[in-house]
């Protein structure tokens, strides 16, 4: 009987250790959005953030572009801080330096998820497509 108790205790300890290790390994996620006149992007972003963070696997930060009419050249996200970039964006094409930084991020192994119509504004950007 003692052998079974020790065995169960050992399994509990192993599961506890693996669970706490998994919880510490959070995927830092940047969600890019803004300037989308055809979708309710704010609500979609909040919903996606809630789903991702409720899994316990992700920590999501929003990065928004300037509103329509604003200077898109002020948009300078720091991709290097993140393991994953989620693009939920339908506005102006990103400035050339941001495009290059994004391409380098992906080339260096950064993760990317493109949501729905986020390919539309980048139609002329070969590397993005």
Cite the ranges covered by each PLM segment.
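Aromatic-Pro/Gly-enriched surface loop or interdomain linker
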Residues: 22-81
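Residues that line or immediately flank small-molecule/substrate-binding pockets and catalytic motifs
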Residues: 8, 89, 119
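Structural motif
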Residues: 84-88
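A glycine-rich, often tryptophan-bearing local segment used as a flexible ligand/cofactor-contacting loop or short
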Residues: 32, 92-129
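Bacterial Sec-dependent N-terminal signal peptides
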Residues: 1-24
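Short, acidic/glycine-rich phosphate-metal binding loop used to engage nucleotide
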Residues: 37, 91-92
């Amino acid at each position: 009987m003692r052998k079974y108790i020790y065995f169960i205790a050992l399994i509990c300890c192993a599961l506890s250790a693996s669970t706490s290790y998994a919880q510490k390994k959070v995927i830092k996620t940047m969600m890019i959005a803004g300037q989308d006149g055809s979708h309710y992007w704010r609500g979609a972003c909040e919903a996606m953030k809630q789903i991702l963070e409720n899994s316990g696997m992700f920590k999501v930060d929003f990065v928004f572009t300037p509103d329509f009419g604003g200077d898109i050249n002020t948009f300078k996200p720091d991709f290097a801080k993140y393991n994953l970039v989620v693009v939920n964006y339908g506005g102006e094409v990103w400035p050339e330096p941001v495009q290059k930084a994004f391409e380098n991020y992906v080339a260096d192994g950064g993760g990317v998820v493109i949501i729905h119509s986020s390919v539309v504004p980048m139609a002329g950007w070969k590397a993005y497509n």
